């Protein structure tokens, strides 16, 4: 039986929904550049984005999926832990997911950036190349012909992309649910038989790892960066 929603969970749901519709239909600049989480080397990066990105979502399906998970699993976790510990879990998981993603992106960016430095370009020239490429939506492959195109695309994605979503926080709630109630049977609309929480949530995360590797993450923080194509040198 579904637990009734507390004021805490209602507030989280309402804030997420209101900010999504506000940023989508009324204040388009609310998400970018203010509230979405940018790469740490990007001038748009601000410390508050580590919190605010958790209340932004890139599309309606992402919002619905996260809010449905919050609605289904959060009430029983809050009842078990208490409101204070539940909020600590929720935001700590969100912060940890953001820190991990920022760290991975920073390492990946610096690795490719250093490869560009070895070609003889200066840091200033590389950043100018990045900014011009982002503005154009494409880049000149002849700037550093020995660097693989995919590496340049990844560098541009890391620098020019933003991260949004409550998925990291939701993941923390799901892990807590699997740890506290591993054998609780779950009845799901798309599965015609009960499945234990530990198996369902375990499969859920495995699918997300696969999705992250293929670029179609289910629950990971959504990255809203654009794709970039290469131009010939004489363009």
Where in this protein do the model-derived segments appear?
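A detector for small-residue-rich transmembrane helices and their helix-helix packing motifs
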Residues: 1-230
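A short, hydrophobic C-terminal helix/tail in secreted or cell-surface proteins
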Residues: 231-235
